[in-house]
């Protein structure tokens, strides 16, 4: 399934739950969404990153439109590196499905020491991205852009 579609499906599921703070769920993209929620609080705050700039969401190409889009480019590159690790060679170790352990406290994400090598790498990709999102301004003009002309 396309990662962007999975993200939208996750958003619908979370919306149906009617909660603004969801504990980590057994699905990686929900975990990443919860990490973003930790660092950028607000009801479903992570949804606004699903179709931002040239790199946030499925795929990515061209030059990032701003600092936030650069966070997504770095995150994409981190996932590419994860897929090259021998420890992440199994289909169940794909960055899009691998489950990992982490904590969220006071807008800070910490990957737990009990993660295996692959889970630790992917958790760190997501942790760095979530903190990068929190440190980067969000420009509504870069949401749902025409990537064929701007990227």
Curated annotation (Swiss-Prot):
<dbReference type="GO" id="GO:0005576">
    <property type="term" value="C:extracellular region"/>
</dbReference>
<dbReference type="GO" id="GO:0090729">
    <property type="term" value="F:toxin activity"/>
</dbReference>
<keyword id="KW-0732">Signal</keyword>
<dbReference type="InterPro" id="IPR016090">
    <property type="entry name" value="PLipase_A2_dom"/>
</dbReference>
<feature type="binding site">
    <location>
        <position position="59"/>
    </location>
    <ligand>
        <name>Ca(2+)</name>
    </ligand>
</feature>
<feature type="active site">
    <location>
        <position position="126"/>
    </location>
</feature>
<keyword id="KW-0964">Secreted</keyword>
<keyword id="KW-0106">Calcium</keyword>
<feature type="disulfide bond">
    <location>
        <begin position="78"/>
        <end position="125"/>
    </location>
</feature>
<feature type="binding site">
    <location>
        <position position="55"/>
    </location>
    <ligand>
        <name>Ca(2+)</name>
    </ligand>
</feature>
<dbReference type="GO" id="GO:0050482">
    <property type="term" value="P:arachidonate secretion"/>
</dbReference>
<feature type="signal peptide">
    <location>
        <begin position="1"/>
        <end position="21"/>
    </location>
</feature>
<dbReference type="GO" id="GO:0047498">
    <property type="term" value="F:calcium-dependent phospholipase A2 activity"/>
</dbReference>
<dbReference type="InterPro" id="IPR033113">
    <property type="entry name" value="PLipase_A2_His_AS"/>
</dbReference>
<keyword id="KW-1015">Disulfide bond</keyword>
<dbReference type="InterPro" id="IPR033112">
    <property type="entry name" value="PLipase_A2_Asp_AS"/>
</dbReference>
<feature type="binding site">
    <location>
        <position position="57"/>
    </location>
    <ligand>
        <name>Ca(2+)</name>
    </ligand>
</feature>
<dbReference type="GO" id="GO:0005509">
    <property type="term" value="F:calcium ion binding"/>
</dbReference>
<dbReference type="InterPro" id="IPR036444">
    <property type="entry name" value="PLipase_A2_dom_sf"/>
</dbReference>
<dbReference type="GO" id="GO:0006633">
    <property type="term" value="P:fatty acid biosynthetic process"/>
</dbReference>
<keyword id="KW-0959">Myotoxin</keyword>
<dbReference type="GO" id="GO:0005102">
    <property type="term" value="F:signaling receptor binding"/>
</dbReference>
<dbReference type="GO" id="GO:0006644">
    <property type="term" value="P:phospholipid metabolic process"/>
</dbReference>
<feature type="disulfide bond">
    <location>
        <begin position="56"/>
        <end position="72"/>
    </location>
</feature>
<protein>
    <recommendedName>
        <fullName>Acidic phospholipase A2 1</fullName>
        <ecNumber>3.1.1.4</ecNumber>
    </recommendedName>
</protein>
<keyword id="KW-0443">Lipid metabolism</keyword>
<feature type="disulfide bond">
    <location>
        <begin position="54"/>
        <end position="151"/>
    </location>
</feature>
<dbReference type="Pfam" id="PF00068">
    <property type="entry name" value="Phospholip_A2_1"/>
</dbReference>
<feature type="disulfide bond">
    <location>
        <begin position="88"/>
        <end position="118"/>
    </location>
</feature>
<keyword id="KW-0378">Hydrolase</keyword>
<keyword id="KW-1199">Hemostasis impairing toxin</keyword>
<feature type="disulfide bond">
    <location>
        <begin position="38"/>
        <end position="104"/>
    </location>
</feature>
<keyword id="KW-1201">Platelet aggregation inhibiting toxin</keyword>
<feature type="propeptide">
    <location>
        <begin position="22"/>
        <end position="27"/>
    </location>
</feature>
<keyword id="KW-0123">Cardiotoxin</keyword>
<dbReference type="InterPro" id="IPR001211">
    <property type="entry name" value="PLipase_A2"/>
</dbReference>
<feature type="disulfide bond">
    <location>
        <begin position="71"/>
        <end position="132"/>
    </location>
</feature>
<keyword id="KW-0442">Lipid degradation</keyword>
<feature type="disulfide bond">
    <location>
        <begin position="111"/>
        <end position="123"/>
    </location>
</feature>
<dbReference type="GO" id="GO:0048146">
    <property type="term" value="P:positive regulation of fibroblast proliferation"/>
</dbReference>
<feature type="active site">
    <location>
        <position position="75"/>
    </location>
</feature>
<feature type="binding site">
    <location>
        <position position="76"/>
    </location>
    <ligand>
        <name>Ca(2+)</name>
    </ligand>
</feature>
